[in-house]
């Protein structure tokens, strides 16, 4: 089954322990990739599909809902602003960081080109968004590296992006 597994971590002992709390089974046909917590007890997750995948939101008592305006080519990493108003998606297929509003109508979608296939997205201590990924001679070269260990010409990259202006460093 495809699911998000939830654990409670207790770091207080000599060794940290993790206790399974429960799980949320994915909607049929959805292959979850990256997950980010939302304020409260909800979360968002990417469905990495090419040419069209999307973001899904889960809330207790409501279940899963496709995030409006989130369809893109290969959504990979995801992060949410601390207030939950903005979602940041690693656009693997578009080689861009995508910012999408949450809870607004109409949905606001903007992106910043980074020039590589984004795999992971996280906030840095200074509040900027770090987008990490890879670039190679072709998009398939990344999959060839993962599957067969043929990694010639493949490079890892990280971009720092301002979460408000979407200016890329």
What are these regions (language model features)?
Residues 1, 20, 25-45, 49-54, ...:
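Beta-rich, blade/repeat-based domains predominating
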Residues 1-11:
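Acidic, Gly/Ser/Thr-rich repeat motifs that build Ca2+-stabilized beta-propeller blades
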Residues 79-82, 86-99:
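Oxyanion-binding "anion nests"
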Residues 18-21, 63-66, 107-111, 167-168:
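Predominantly a core beta-strand signature of beta-propeller blades
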Residues 9-13, 58-62, 101-105, 162-166:
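Short loop/turn segments that connect beta-strands within beta-propeller blades
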Residues 3-5, 53-56, 96-98, 157-159:
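A short loop-to-beta-strand structural motif that recurs across blades of beta-propeller domains
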Residues 1, 45-52, 132-153:
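Short, conserved, GDST-rich strand-edge loop motifs in beta-rich repeat architectures
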Residues 96-146:
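A beta-strand-loop signature enriched in Asp, Gly, Thr, and Trp
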């Amino acid at each position: 089954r495809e699911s998000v597994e939830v654990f409670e971590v207790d770091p207080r002992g000599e060794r940290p322990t993790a206790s399974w709390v429960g799980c949320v089974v994915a909607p049929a046909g959805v292959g979850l990739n990256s997950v980010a917590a939302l304020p409260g007890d909800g979360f968002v997750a990417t469905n990495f599909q090419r040419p069209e995948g999307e973001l899904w939101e889960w809330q207790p008592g409501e279940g899963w809902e496709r995030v409006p305006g989130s369809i893109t080519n290969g959504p990979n990493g995801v992060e949410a602003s601390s207030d939950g108003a903005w979602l940041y998606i690693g656009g693997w297929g578009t080689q861009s960081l995508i910012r999408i509003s949450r809870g607004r109508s109409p949905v606001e979608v903007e992106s910043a080109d980074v020039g590589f296939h984004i795999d992971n997205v996280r906030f840095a201590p200074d509040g900027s968004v770090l987008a990490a990924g890879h670039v190679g001679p072709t998009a398939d070269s990344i999959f060839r590296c993962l599957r067969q260990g043929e990694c010639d010409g493949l490079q890892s990259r990280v971009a720092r992006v301002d979460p408000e202006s979407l200016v890329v460093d």
